[in-house]
Amino acid sequence: MHQTLGAVRLAYRSRIANLVKSGMIDNAVQVFDEMRHSSYRVFSFDYNRFIGVLVRESRFELAEAIYWDMKPMGFSLIPFTYSRFISGLCKVKKFDLIDALLSDMETLGFIPDIWAFNVYLDLLCRENKVGFAVQTFFCMVQRGREPDVVSYTILINGLFRAGKVTDAVEIWNAMIRSGVSPDNKACAALVVGLCHARKVDLAYEMVAEEIKSARVKLSTVVYNALISGFCKAGRIEKAEALKSYMSKIGCEPDLVTYNVLLNYYYDNNMLKRAEGVMAEMVRSGIQLDAYSYNQLLKRHCRVSHPDKCYNFMVKEMEPRGFCDVVSYSTLIETFCRASNTRKAYRLFEEMRQKGMVMNVVTYTSLIKAFLREGNSSVAKKLLDQMTELGLSPDRIFYTTILDHLCKSGNVDKAYGVFNDMIEHEITPDAISYNSLISGLCRSGRVTEAIKLFEDMKGKECCPDELTFKFIIGGLIRGKKLSAAYKVWDQMMDKGFTLDRDVSDTLIKASCSMSADA
């Protein structure tokens, strides 16, 4: 009898295996169901094996149903099946069931394998649950799951995406302390995150040992992030030195490397160096892309007549398929700066005829130009078009309008735009605050400017050198010298210096007030 039962059980298992092999999963489910409801005993092995099949086939609802049927029988999954189940559920983001499985594993004294652990961490970070990801990470470590370099990299990436720069650096340090060696992906996560947060010096310092020792073969992604970071910080010599070092160690600069340098050179009018980089690209066999040509167009717009720039776009860029919204926006801004708003608007219409999707930058240039000319009706029409297209004004747009209104003496309207910006959950930066503070000070409304200055500090938007200069200038004009001196002290505490002419004016005004007294 025992042999007969065993033979029947083996026959069921064989039928299920053959059906699975043939891709007939629904039929396999029917046979497994038949087996479960027969008089022949089904073992934990059978449940583990079949749930594993269902997970592999992404039949998660069936796998869940069978799992809950299995539990009251006193059966459990083995750690491997639990881990595969959790990994699969991460694809469909079924957090409730994942939590239940993790809880069951903890009760049984199991921990997920490193693959499931990392997949779950990655899901939490991608779903903006980075705080819970960190908590889960340390909880698993306490239970004996040793994280690998992938685990740390996932957390570092997630923390940087969430803007938690200090926490990301601490996770990196924890990785080093634990003896886990960083690889290229870990270094890239750290460097890209820090450079994005404008902390290029810290980024370089933290991977300098890997760069010098060549323990890790760093990719162009790491070097490009550092080069871009140094360029943004205005330290081109450091960027160029890194680019030279790349070539020496056999990590050849790529198109991104050259484009980053080109962008800096053209922005800073370093035309000879830009030409040298272009020549080097040709020698290296690197083909220019749309970004490269847009940098060239930007260069032409700085030194040539706008019409020549337009000809360059039509003759050199358009035949290569490199003429895009960036190209047109660059030209529109150039014609607007040259007070040729009609030509700029014709280019705008040309874009529409070609079916190009305009962006906020395009509209910002035109709206600013028409406002400058006093043509508010066209500016309003363009703003309405923006809204219809679903283009939300960004910080640059609002700041541009703010600056124009303040310079035109329309400070009350500017205040309205500033409040509208906040209502739309766009956080003003130092440039936005400076535009309004400057306008208020020029209008003799220094008390309101001071209030805005204090509000700025309360919002953790650090006043820069210009902010202090505007406030001090307004206080001097309002003959509030005592307050001006206090702000000057704050300015010096921040490491900023006052222009010689402003400091002289402040001292002279003080002397004059003393003499009158």
UniProtKB/Swiss-Prot annotation:
The keyword Repeat applies. It is found in: Mitochondrion. InterPro entries: Mito_RNA_Proc_CCM1, Pentatricopeptide_rpt, TPR-like_helical_dom_sf. GO terms for cellular component: mitochondrion; plant-type vacuole. PPR repeats lie at residues 8-42, 43-77, 78-112, 113-147, 148-182, 183-218, 219-253, 254-288, 289-320, 324-358, 359-393, 394-428, 429-463, 464-498. It comes from the Eukaryota. PROSITE patterns: PPR. Keywords: Mitochondrion, Repeat, Transit peptide. Residues 1-57 form a transit peptide. Belongs to the PPR family. P subfamily. This is Pentatricopeptide repeat-containing protein At1g13040, mitochondrial. It comes from Arabidopsis thaliana (Mouse-ear cress). The lineage of its organism: Eukaryota, Viridiplantae, Streptophyta, Embryophyta, Tracheophyta.
